[in-house]
Amino acid sequence: MKGNVIVGQSGGPTSAINSSLAGVYRTAIDRGAPKVYGMLHGIQGFLDEQYVDLSEHIRNDLDVELLKRTPAAYLGSCRYKLPEIHEDLEVYEKIFGILEKLEIESFIYIGGNDSMDTIKKLSDYAIVMGYPTRFIGCPKTIDNDLALTDHTPGYGSAAKYIGTSMKEIIRDSFCLEYSKGLVTIVEVMGRNAGWLTGASALAEGEDCEGPDMIYMPELSFDVVNFRDRVASLLEKKTSVVVAVSEGICTADGKYVCELGNSVDFVDAFGHKQLSGTAAYLANYIAG
């Protein structure tokens, strides 16, 4: 490796995101990269020329090991959506101007789907303009929904947390004196992918029967059928625990959380901020 490397972190930090950073840094150094830069606060910070020489901060093997176990995102993060090339050419010219100044051979971005969108746009521009820089996406998402990736770094720890939390909730529901007729609906992250909600099944074991029902966004949701199934379970059990993805939709494609209130806020990538699915369902079966 003759040229320099730059690496950034983007999106929500996972417990493994700094391990990926440590791996990128160590591999780049081992392959002979003269310098390994870290962009501060992702591509948004890079546009303001905020970056550091990582060798000044990661000085030995102990620092690498400590970085692996450091929480949050060591370099800082962002949720900045790159415009399309035809929408704002100046943004791309600025980015590639900085890359040329730093003599960057490889640009590595640690993140999920939106971060891969950034990598694709930069790669497309480089191909069109004939730049030799390589743009590489390093997978990171608790949603486990990156194409061609079996288990994304970040998913395992999130799945373990959900399974453990669900087991505690289920055990609590059976030890409460007033639990007869109690229905607990646990809303889990997952707009379009149900991997996290599915992980609630990890609660099942010798000491726990697991959630009674699990609803994921890959299948359409029927609120009437849900109410009837809860009622049927309560005829056999003193309490019911259900796991639902925040992004479950009815057959016509409407988010269940929007049945009660409209969702107005969207992020930089146009994603609606979903919340209230469990609250709506709780009110529905109670009413």
Predicted regions and their residues:
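Short glycine-rich or small-residue beta-strand-to-loop segments that form or flank ligand, phosphate
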Residues: 4-14, 73-79, 105-111, 183-188, ...
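Gly-rich Lys/Arg/Thr-decorated short loops/hinges at beta-loop-alpha junctions or inter-strand turns
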Residues: 2-7, 67-81, 140-150, 180-182, ...
